[in-house]
Amino acid sequence: MDQTVYLEVNASQKPAIELLQSMGYTYISPEDCEKQRGSKYHVLLKDILRGQLRKLNRYTYAGAVNEFSAGNIERAMDELDEPLTDGLVRTSEKVYDALLMGKSYPETVGNGKSLSFNLKYIDWDNWDNNLFHITEEYAVESQDKQHNARPDIVLFINGIPFAVIECKAPHISEEQAVEQMIRNQQADYIPQLFKYAQIVVATNKNAVKYATTGTPKKFWNVWKEENDTFLNAALATHITDRTPTEQDRNIVSLFSKERVKELVRYFVLFDANVKKICRYQQFFAINEITSGNK
């Protein structure tokens, strides 16, 4: 292993994974991920997703609570995997809408009648019902098999990849990670991963930028945590054997489970085929306004 790769792994990637595990994300090896994916082109962790769709979803008819049919569970998984024919951002919007609102599927009820019921991919109201995983070196292949990429860290909710982190050695600018992330989203690389991603992060331990799918380089932002009580308590809980880095502070700020819920549910938007995620100033200003109205 050359020195740059060694530093990337040991100064950035490994500490990030350890911190995320301490924050409640379950590590799953690349090999175990691949068994669930079906191929290196596909990116959903299907066994986890299937199990969560069964667990999270019931419909009520005539006072009886019922499970969705196995066929509808499979259909819901297939339909979440939207084709990229409309381009990455429009496809990402379709996926985002499904993650927020679910999809409706017909079930046969009494006397052979068919009624439609809503099926959810993420339980926004009972957040602890969801499963959170991380993996590393997530090998993904382009559709024509001419390109492949291996994002350093991918985060999942219920087997759905919602965030990607690209790590660099401390002496390599985080801008290189930004450029790599943007390249990987191009049509001839691995856009099928990024149609699910809501948060993307470029880090070299000492400097961090974040964005969302399709964000041009000039609009990648830095996050400055304004809730010092939250941040300091989390760092004290999860990092006990070293001095926290800028990367640590950003991981806590962006990927603490409750913060993920807020950012993804309320602070991602689509405007004229542009996908946006809030700047930190917007996040804290809106939270201050809404908390004052309670």
Model regions: which residues?
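ATP-dependent helicase/translocase motor core
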Residues: 2-11, 15-294
